From Swiss-Prot:
Lineage: Bacteria, Pseudomonadati, Pseudomonadota, Alphaproteobacteria, Hyphomicrobiales
Keyword Chaperone recorded: no
Binding site for ATP: K253
Domain of life: Bacteria
Motif mapping: 'KMSKS' region: 250-254
EC class of the enzyme, as a word: ligase
Database matches in InterPro entries: aa-tRNA-synth_I_cd-bd (IPR045462), aa-tRNA-synth_I_codon-bd_sub2 (IPR020751), aa-tRNA-synth_I_CS (IPR001412), aa_tRNA-synth_I_cd-bd_sf (IPR008925), Glu-tRNA-ligase_bac/mito (IPR004527), Glu/Gln-tRNA-synth (IPR000924), Glu/Gln-tRNA-synth_Ib_cat-dom (IPR020058), GluQ/Sye (IPR049940)
Annotated NCBIfam families: gltX_bact
Cellular localisation: Cytoplasm
MF (Gene Ontology): ATP binding; glutamate-tRNA ligase activity; tRNA binding; zinc ion binding
Disulphide bond pairs: none
Record organism: Brucella canis (strain ATCC 23365 / NCTC 10854 / RM-666)
Name this protein carries in UniProt: Glutamate--tRNA ligase 1
Amino acid sequence: MTVTVRFAPSPTGYIHIGNTRTALSNWLYASKNNGKFILRYDDTDVERSKDEYAQAIAVDLDWLGVRPDRVEYQSKRFDIYAKAVEKLKTAGLLYACYETADELERRRKLRLARRLPPVYGREALKLTDAEKAALEAEGRKPHWRFLLPNFESDPFATQRTEVHWDDLVRGPQTVDLASMSDPILVREDGTYLYTLPSVVDDIDMGVTHIIRGDDHVTNTGVQISIFKALGATPPVFGHHNLLTTISGEGLSKRTGALSVGSLREAGYEPMAVASLAILIGTSESVTAAPDMAALAEHFDLASISKSSAKFDPSELDALNRSLLHEMPFEKAKPRLEALGICGAKAESFWLAVRGNLDRFSDVSDWWQVVSGDLPEAPDLSGEDRDFVRHAFDLLPPEPWNGQTWKSWTEAVKSATGRKGKNLFMPLRLALTGQAHGPELADLLVLVGLERTKSRRP
């Protein structure tokens, strides 16, 4: 059996880091099991689904390193769903209902008042053909419910009916179908809710494992029943915990700041986003994996906590810095060249500055420091200005190397009596225009004698 998984986003908005957790969990599970990954757009809501969102999702996944083996659109498969509807109708498992939302709400309140579970009472099953015709003559159109197998022979005599599965994340799970309403599969206008197309596609596409958020745990009992009603063996299920904001709020497509696109535009590395999305809320330590192969080594569905995990942007910042600070030159080289950073000193420059980067784009500012002019003259006090001028008069001739800074500052210390911060800070400001940054022993060689002299205040 070939392991086949799917990620099925609705292209009604941009995906966020919570969606990324689901996509990457499926991708890594397939990768570790030599399986297949299907990207399936749940675009049955044709009015809200937009091609621009579908394209954005594809771009976001590609940026993260997720490359589907197959791409499908549910909007192109309505004829397949129609056949499944007819099959369920013929089997007596899909029945027409005519209640309005207000009528259903009144019935729900009445059941609660009688201390009964607020589930649908299957009143529509009692309608005669004449009563249905009369309702349709009034202009009502039916919606269609799936008849859950929670009874022996009388659908009005429901009984405890347990559905069991061994969850890849949560272990043995049980759902009682008697506590649920028969789900609506087809709306009044003939469009489909999520449930039926999802099950039909999973069957048709040979999906063997469904990995998704634990907000779908209850749905699983219903979906297993539909799989069986359509004559299929249910796949293996795994439900990971959900990500929330620091304040505990659920993530949504309206949380724009946490969309994958916004994180990319903010300069985060894809592996920083991927590492946090996968490792947060697990028993694994949250560390930055340099690539997908390394992340796969730490990926284990069984290690995921059953409690929700809070997404802290500061953790993402820390992971991003870790990746940049340890990034080898060969990996950074193409990106440096794209920024015009190349030549004989590119490698030594990268090794000098990488430990001070929060974002890769910060590298351009440091390249300007070592190869261009400072944006503005450093703000030095009169005493510090005189000190720096004296120090610059003591600059040794080239060639310079890694020991030049030490020998120069020792000479300056002897000549001026300054030491520690009082010596180094004015020189740093004069050389770089910044109060903090890479080791000056490394930068001085990169700046060179002539450019250093040009910065004499």
